[in-house]
């Protein structure tokens, strides 16, 4: 009798544990699909807004949902449901149109119908130069530990959104471009680190981004570790974590 009772209790405990795990996985899947999804920053194309080693939450609900919102992106439907358009200046994660297995994060610069052009390193939207002012240099260290000073600008879009951009070199390859006319239903994306960003200026690699490819809006940095360090090495956190960036709102 006692052996049978003990066996039943053990089986009941295992079943309860399994139910808790299944429920937790379902809740996590719902949150990841419909509310927030974590991403990390692998490159410096959005410096200094986002740094290599930043981990952030992206809101999935900001622009509605497409099949790219779902795990593994099954082509269950086309277009978006509960759709809302990104605004100029939003920092968004999207699937690369040329290879939809790759996620990119950039800033929305051009809306459908806009004309975008770079002239001598200055952004022009619909024929008008975007306001920018020089601010103090961005100071960083290279892979050899040497201090680098990079020109930094504050750029303000026509809707009043301001952010900083970096200028690594003068007369960069994409400092002078033809006029890009953004097609209907598409958006023009650029990185804040203008001379180190493969973005919509490179039509052969990125080009215009359809609304359907947009996954969500970057909201908050929840963790940040210096580039080259590993987040799982918790014993290095006291000196490798960028504590000042934790819970920073992405703007």
What function would you assign to each model-found segment?
Residues 17-21, 25, 29:
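Alpha-helical transmembrane spans of integral membrane proteins, capturing the lipid-embedded, hydrophobic core
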């Amino acid at each position: 009798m006692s052996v049978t009772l003990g066996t039943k209790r053990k089986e009941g405990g295992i079943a309860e544990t399994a139910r808790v795990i299944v429920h937790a996985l379902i809740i996590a899947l719902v949150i990841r699909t419909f509310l927030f999804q974590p991403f990390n920053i692998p490159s410096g194309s959005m410096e200094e807004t986002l740094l290599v080693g930043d981990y952030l939450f992206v809101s999935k609900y900001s622009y509605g949902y497409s099949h790219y919102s779902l795990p593994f992106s099954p082509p269950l439907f086309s277009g978006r449901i509960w759709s809302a358009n990104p605004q100029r200046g939003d920092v968004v994660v999207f699937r690369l149109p040329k290879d939809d297995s790759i996620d990119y994060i950039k800033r929305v610069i051009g809306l459908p119908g806009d004309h975008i052009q770079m002239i001598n390193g200055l952004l022009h939207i619909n024929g008008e130069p975007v306001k920018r002012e020089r601010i103090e240099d961005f100071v960083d260290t290279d892979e050899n530990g040497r201090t680098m000073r990079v020109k930094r600008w504050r750029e303000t879009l026509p809707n009043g959104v301001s952010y900083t951009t970096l200028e690594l070199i003068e007369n960069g390859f994409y400092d002078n471009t033809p006029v890009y006319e953004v097609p209907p239903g598409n958006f023009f994306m650029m990185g804040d680190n203008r001379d180190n960003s493969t973005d919509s200026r490179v039509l052969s690699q990125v080009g215009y981004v359809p609304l359907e490819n947009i996954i969500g809006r970057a909201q908050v940095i929840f963790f940040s570790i210096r580039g080259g360090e590993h987040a799982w090495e918790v014993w290095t956190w006291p000196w490798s974590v960028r504590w000042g960036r934790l819970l920073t709102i992405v703007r």
